[in-house]
UniProtKB/Swiss-Prot annotation:
InterPro entries reported in the protein's UniProt record: NAD(P)-bd_dom, NAD(P)-bd_dom_sf
Enzyme superclass (EC): oxidoreductase
EC id: 1.-.-.-
Associated pathway: Pigment biosynthesis
Function: Oxidoreductase; part of the gene cluster that mediates the biosynthesis of the bianthraquinone cladofulvin, a conidial pigment not required for virulence but that plays a role in fitness and resistance to environmental stresses including UV light and low-temperature stress. The pathway begins with the synthesis of atrochrysone thioester by the polyketide synthase (PKS) claG. The atrochrysone carboxyl ACP thioesterase claF then breaks the thioester bond and releases the atrochrysone carboxylic acid from claG.
Keyword 4Fe-4S appears in the UniProt entry: no
One Gene Ontology molecular-function label: monooxygenase activity
Keyword Chaperone: no
Gene symbol of the encoding locus: claK
Family: Belongs to the avfA family.
Annotated protein name in UniProt: Oxidoreductase claK
SUPFAM superfamilies to which the protein is assigned, alphabetical: NAD(P)-binding Rossmann-fold domains (SSF51735)
Taxonomic source organism: Passalora fulva (Tomato leaf mold)
Amino acid sequence: MDSKVTTYAVLGSTGNCGSALIRNLLGKPQSRVHAFCRNKKKLLRLIPEIADSKQVEVFEGGMQDHDLLAACIKNTRAVFMCISTNDNVPGCRLSQDSAIALVKVMRELGYDKPDGGPNGPAPKLLLLSSGTIDPHLSKHLPSLLLWILKRSASHVYADLEKAEEFLRAQESWLTTIYIKPGALSVDKKRGYELSLTEQKDPVSYLDLSAGMIEAADDPEGRWDLKNISVNCGSTPAGFPDGTILCILMGLLRHYFPWTHAYLPMGMGPK
């Protein structure tokens, strides 16, 4: 591999965050992307320019295909974990199952060995989580709003908390950065800043992903093993369409889980 080329793996490439990561990395000529997704056709519809791009290699399959996942993450600097949902699905395990599968594959590749094994040092992981479940980052949110948000995505947050707990248990050999933004919006780039102290919202997915790349690339590892928020710069992103409906559907799923089968899916920022 060309020593000047840096390769990143994006898990969940067809989501808002995953696709924004790919778009930002395409703007860095020395970057290569291993895009992991369940549906290659969907990814090509979202980002048609990657069809003929030498910067992007698509890995189509599920997280339980360990050979495919291993090929995707080998020789990468960082693995962006963006597999989640905006729907408050009862019993949600997307983040947990992704973390468990990824760590198992990394162990199989020998990354847990003191010298990193034959495949070299382990890539950093960047888990897309939420500032809502971090008391320090969310300390300035109005208490009523925080109460509502925690319940409207309770199943998703429980999944994220367990995934984080699992990844923190691997920190003797594995470096994870926990990305915890506030509200997210499908909007243009407006500028961003990384913070260890507070969340400001909303921020666009393009700015969120740019901040994630900056954290992954930091030569001093200042963000390693930390909870960080990617905040808007001087101009906040537009208020995300669909937020109110997403919260209402999430509250129904929290208090009446049996209604899940009858409620619409695909909620969240538009």
